[in-house]
């Protein structure tokens, strides 16, 4: 079994998605979440949970949330697993 090395909570701002066309905003939000976690957790292999995907796409492609609260775990094999934080 793979052990987790580091666990961190982040509130990821998604204000930058307002600068892209409306029909592309949720896809851009998913890319921004992955890039944020890659930068802060120092890993290129980031795996997002299905619950994050459902939260971002819940209001369609034109209206993603302004911010997402995420729990990220860096595992000993080097990849980062992210899940939506319970509120």
Swiss-Prot record:
GO terms for biological process: cytoplasmic translation. It comes from the Archaea. The keyword Metal-binding does not apply. GO terms for cellular component: cytosolic large ribosomal subunit. Keywords: Ribonucleoprotein, Ribosomal protein. GO terms for molecular function: structural constituent of ribosome. InterPro entries: Ribosomal_eL31, Ribosomal_eL31_CS, Ribosomal_eL31_dom_sf. The keyword Ribonucleoprotein applies. Belongs to the eukaryotic ribosomal protein eL31 family. HAMAP family: Ribosomal_eL31. This is Large ribosomal subunit protein eL31.
């Amino acid at each position: 079994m793979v052990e987790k090395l580091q666990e961190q909570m982040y509130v990821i701002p998604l204000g930058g998605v307002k600068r892209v066309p409306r029909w592309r905003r949720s896809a851009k939000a998913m890319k921004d979440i992955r890039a944020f976690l890659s930068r802060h957790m120092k890993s290129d292999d980031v795996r997002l949970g299905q619950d994050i995907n459902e939260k971002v796409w819940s209001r369609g492609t034109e209206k993603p949330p302004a911010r997402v609260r995420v729990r990220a775990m860096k595992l000993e094999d080097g990849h980062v697993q992210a899940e939506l934080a319970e509120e």
